[in-house]
Amino acid sequence: MLGIILSTILLSDTVATDRVQNLDEVVIVSEARRGRKRSVKGQVASIDEHLSELRNVSLVRRGSYAWEPVVNNMQTERLSTTIDGMKIFYACTDKMDPVTSYVESGNLQSISLNSGLDGNPQATGNIGGSLDLKLRKAGFDNNPFHASASAGHEWNGHVQVYGADAALSSHRTYLNAGAFYRHADNYKVGGGDELQFSQFQKVNVFANAGLRLAEKDMLEGTLIFDRATDVGYPALNMDVAKAEGLITSLAYKHLFRKASWETKAYYNHITHVMDDTTRPDVAIHMDMPGDSWTAGVYSLLTTALRQHDLALNYDLYYNRLFADMTMYPGGAAPMYMVTWPDVGTLNTGLALTDNISIAHNQSLRLSAKVAWQQQCLHNEEGYHALKVFFPGMTDAYHQTTGRIAANYALSIKNYALSIGAGWGSRAPTVTEAYGYYLNNTFDQYDYMGNPSLKNESAVELNGAAKLSVLNSQLSVEGNVFLFSNYIIGQFENRLSAMTVGAEGVKVYGNISHATIANLSLTWDWQISEHLSWNEKVSYSSGRDADGDPLPLISPISWQSELQYQNQRFQAQATVKGNTRQSSYGEKYGETAAKAWTILNFSAQYQFIVHNSQFIVSAGLENLFDKHYATYADWNHIPQKGRNIYMNLTFEL
């Protein structure tokens, strides 16, 4: 197969057309496109609000900032998140800084989702799914000059958003750059009470540049600097003084008649500093900094051979993770502890994807990846601290992981059907393998890593069907993941907790099997040319080897949306909610979330003045000022109460 791809490339001599990835879903960030999802707040919306538009995505919320994406009811450990194909790793042991928090809406063109084991080429360990945040680039041969500015305000929490960017483009070069600023005070929950420590502020600047070396050869570079300060986390015991990311890349592209070849080298550095100095009645003050450094490269070839659309990707990255903690007990000497022992991870992998057109109404998608990684512990103090509990451990480990998936799709008149299956595995994360006394406020236990963990694996089965009748569509889709060696924290009564107030200690371990299943039903009705109605109901289930519920599995959720749209104006009313969480992970420290329902309104109007486009949007969220928390709100911190927002975007 590789020989066929290379032969095709060598025989080609003209510019290729753009290849389109087979994605489960895309949400547009920077511009509206018919048939593609977009947040009602437009580009002023936060990354978290854009992510919430994706069908299989929910978000774990620990405060107003940096929500953790969850795909198919699986959190960060079982997902792959890349930024334009680049691997980036968070630097906080408490997962307070997901990868998505280090970019802004102004940086992005779109966010793409591959559900389950059929990941994007650079994805590794993506049992639940993979997210790729596509950067917004001016590109060659586009508008010679383009500029835009955005401003937004939300009354609840006095959220202020300001952004501006400009772009230059020609046949030989392009450049686009911009800056974004967000600031929020504490917000009020339903009923009017202020939620302390829910404030944040953030600055983001970025630049993308391209140079055409020859007609078919191009260089592209990216620089993003993102800095959040004074970030409150009301669900946790600590806040964040600084979360800072520097993201850089340099890519070379060569185009052929029916193929393209891109090679990108990248480097990023994430710094995260937790802070409890603003909290009242702190028993023991703690400093908890963390750092993540990643350097990597990938090389991607794409081509079309008759009925085949092929993609071959090689990637390699090296990541270092280090975190420590210093405790300052009153009247005693400071106590120092390494929580991530400077773990260096070298990972390399090869992926192949083939989209096959069997007939005009049938297609088959095949994808596979194999990856090898080696991890070394570079901090002697952290290594020897773990070795006390695991005498047989060494300071170096290696794992081999992989995935393979197939999906068949058939379309006949008003019917569409797809079925798929896959198998994949993932290596334990640094926290799961080498974390040292990491306090988890979800269940109030200290967690210990386990270097002897086995790789986790899963078999995925999925299917979807769609029926179109007159002006309506009825869709049903579902998947089930059958896990082996599922990794989760397990009680260890022989160890004593270190954190003040902790219930005890858990050590990560493998359980023989677990199951996560998801099912959704969607109905879309185009009532008239301008009026549409959408209904959706989702059900999920997660069980461990003993048949007990897994934590953070969504209860039944539902949403009903009525939308009016013409060329320049659109408005929508949305009612959404969850049922009471009757099946929850009590065994794992979870408590049940109550049922809730809220009503939102939004509207948007576009107009042109002297060749400049203006977009005004406004909305009312949680109309009845409902006091509620979702199942994914950490420690049931309540959501915002009634909120009014207004945004303005100007494009020249």
Identify the meaning behind each predicted range.
Residues 51-87:
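Extracytoplasmic beta-strand/coil segments of soluble accessory domains associated
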Residues 357-364, 370-375, 379, 468, ...:
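Gram-negative outer-membrane beta-barrel transporters
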Residues 184-187, 192, 196-202, 212-294, ...:
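Flexible loop and strand-edge segments within Gram-negative outer membrane beta-barrel domains
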Residues 43-51, 67-70, 82, 98-101, ...:
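N-terminal periplasmic accessory domains that precede
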Residues 203, 210-213, 354-355, 401, ...:
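Conserved C-terminal beta-signal and adjacent last beta-strands/turns
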Residues 87-116:
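Short acidic/polar hinge/loop motifs at secondary-structure boundaries
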Residues 236-257, 288-294, 339, 343-345, ...:
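Outer-membrane beta-barrel signature, preferentially recognizing the C-terminal barrel domain
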Residues 227-229, 269-273, 320-330, 372-396, ...:
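Surface-exposed extracellular loop regions of Gram-negative outer-membrane beta-barrel proteins
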